[in-house]
Amino acid sequence: MDVIKKKHWWQSDALKWSVLGLLGLLVGYLVVLMYAQGEYLFAITTLILSSAGLYIFANRKAYAWRYVYPGMAGMGLFVLFPLVCTIAIAFTNYSSTNQLTFERAQEVLLDRSWQAGKTYNFGLYPAGDEWQLALSDGETGKNYLSDAFKFGGEQKLQLKETTAQPEGERANLRVITQNRQALSDITAILPDGNKVMMSSLRQFSGTQPLYTLDGDGTLTNNQSGVKYRPNNQIGFYQSITADGNWGDEKLSPGYTVTTGWKNFTRVFTDEGIQKPFLAIFVWTVVFSLITVFLTVAVGMVLACLVQWEALRGKAVYRVLLILPYAVPSFISILIFKGLFNQSFGEINMMLSALFGVKPAWFSDPTTARTMLIIVNTWLGYPYMMILCMGLLKAIPDDLYEASAMDGAGLFQNFFKITLPLLIKPLTPLMIASFAFNFNNFVLIQLLTNGGPDRLGTTTPAGYTDLLVNYTYRIAFEGGGGQDFGLAAAIATLIFLLVGALAIVNLKATRMKFD
């Protein structure tokens, strides 16, 4: 007799389809909101990932994909999506001055106004639960008063000329400041038909739009008469001369346009960018190679020492040597920054007492780079030591016994047996370490902040900057504005360089991907 298993309420198909339906509606609502806000890339990504997830968890035939989907969705969202966005930005002029769309930039310019008429002093007087607006003309001495009104939204107030003083006490500056936004939405209409709006905390003035949009898309400055035309090569409204050529004046804010390969060509053709870029690239490669070599060398030697059978107290030494790995790196970096202080650091005090020298760790390029390598070796050797300690356990003791019978010494054992057997399994990890140090942003940012700075460069660059720090400084610390497009182009080049170097390393060591 077959036993029919009773399903719990949370296992019912009705509940499953109800939850999936609600999630589908929520996702659809979010996608529509993103699309309405102009965030097309986010909307498409959300739609693809959510639709795939709903299909996989609703379809029994796709049951096996339920174990793979979270990882693939995470990789797509946190790896591929930022990569695609970065590459897309690299082909635009996106920067602190060119962030808006053309339509939004045009709207901002058309919203600007200029003072084109008389200025009137104004006062705000209570009228029960409402207010009255009073204007006075300082030239003619005429006074104008509105009917009672309440704050809220855009409104037009018809003012009448009066000789009587409004009742009640005039509102102080605090009340006006609190209601400044509401007062800015008020248009006061004088008896002669002129319109005035709030221009300061105590004045209403006649205002007119600063720019007028012509039928051919040209903006005309109503104050100066200068005409501006959108220049899609640079992403700005730019003035035009009488003969139709481009003038020197540009209107901010600008708008985002596609510039093609311009940002990439700037890296290789602009000497102010090319020279620091190439120098920083060479230093980044050298820094990564030296760091990998020293961390592996120090870690391997220390692993061999703490695995030495004749050594007493090996457990204590292991714990002490692994401590730098247990302490968060940013804490160690800041501690070293204090130790290397040129005036009061303990390292310079010790060197001065012993040898009479005080290296300029933060102002001299060579010593600053040396300091970085020392600190990074300190931070990285425990990881390599732990790996080597585990790999040493896999080396058979018979090999060392056979070499001892042949009369091999300590160094021969290390270079002929230990090193060859360790270096092969360590190679993939060394490549990963190289890629990590190639983009070791935190070390540079916390210890030297890229300094000392290079002189004569178009973009901010330092002697200890890695490519990733150089990109960050261009994007967020540029003196001439934040150039996200150029930074994205350099980030794309970094991605290609790291990928190419990793492939070259794998090919050189003849490592098989499987």
Swiss-Prot record:
Positions of the ABC transmembrane type-1 domain: 281-505
Residue spans crossing the bilayer: 14-34, 38-58, 71-91, 277-297, 320-340, 372-392, 417-437, 484-504
Main localization, broad class: membrane
Pfam families: BPD_transp_1 (PF00528), MalF_N_TM (PF20872), MalF_P2 (PF14785)
GO molecular function (one): ABC-type maltose transporter activity
UniProt entry tagged with the keyword Cell inner membrane: yes
Stretches assigned to the Periplasmic side: 35-37, 92-276, 341-371, 438-483
One of the GO BP terms on file: maltodextrin transmembrane transport
Disulphide bridges, residue numbers: none
Keywords, alphabetical: Cell inner membrane, Cell membrane, Membrane, Sugar transport, Transmembrane, Transmembrane helix, Transport
Residue intervals annotated with topology Cytoplasmic: 1-13, 59-70, 298-319, 393-416, 505-514
One CC-aspect GO term: maltose transport complex
Subcellular location: Cell inner membrane
UniProt topology in membrane: Multi-pass membrane protein
Role: Part of the ABC transporter complex MalEFGK involved in maltose/maltodextrin import. Probably responsible for the translocation of the substrate across the membrane.
Family membership noted in the UniProt record: Belongs to the binding-protein-dependent transport system permease family. MalFG subfamily.
PANTHER family xref list: MALTOSE/MALTODEXTRIN TRANSPORT SYSTEM PERMEASE PROTEIN MALF (PTHR47314), MALTOSE_MALTODEXTRIN TRANSPORT SYSTEM PERMEASE PROTEIN MALF (PTHR47314:SF1)
Subunit-structure text: The complex is composed of two ATP-binding proteins (MalK), two transmembrane proteins (MalG and MalF) and a solute-binding protein (MalE).
Protein's UniProt name: Maltose/maltodextrin transport system permease protein MalF
Provenance organism: Shigella flexneri
Gene name of the encoded protein: malF
